[in-house]
Amino acid sequence: MPALNSLAAKPFDTTTTFADRISFVHIYVVEPHPKAPEVSPYSGNVWEAQYSTKIQPHTYEQRCANARDTGALVTGRQLMLVDALTPGANNPVWCTYGTCPNCAFLIRQDGTVDTVHTWFNAASMESAMRTLLAR
């Protein structure tokens, strides 16, 4: 999960609306804009942003530490998971679901992906959640 910023703040407002009917899971993956001198996985260059506070983890333990720090910002009934970072199994969730820095997925209880956002849009996702719950 990228460092939380103003673009990512809205999901946490949405969780309070649907907390009793939808489970919210955050997955901590690669840092899109790690703190220098680390490079972005998207550009291959240093690409810091104002919210770049973490280095790119090189071990699973470092990634878990970053996730704990970020998880402290997650409130309510939400789950924070950490993508794998081991030789031969690096970033399976990030690689499988899309290497986007701010994506979101609405997944039905049967495991079917209902809605995909390659760049999270709170209003659109909220609409998709309401539609899914109305079925």
Could you describe each region identified by the protein language model?
Residues 2-5, 126, 130:
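Amphipathic, non-transmembrane alpha-helical secondary structure
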Residues 74-77, 82-128:
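Thiol/disulfide oxidoreductase modules built on the thioredoxin-like
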Residues 133-134:
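Short, hydrophobic alpha-helical segments
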Residues 1-74, 87-90:
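Structural microenvironment flanking redox-active thiols in thiol-disulfide oxidoreductases
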Residues 10-11, 46-50, 102-106, 128-130:
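Short, surface-exposed linear patches
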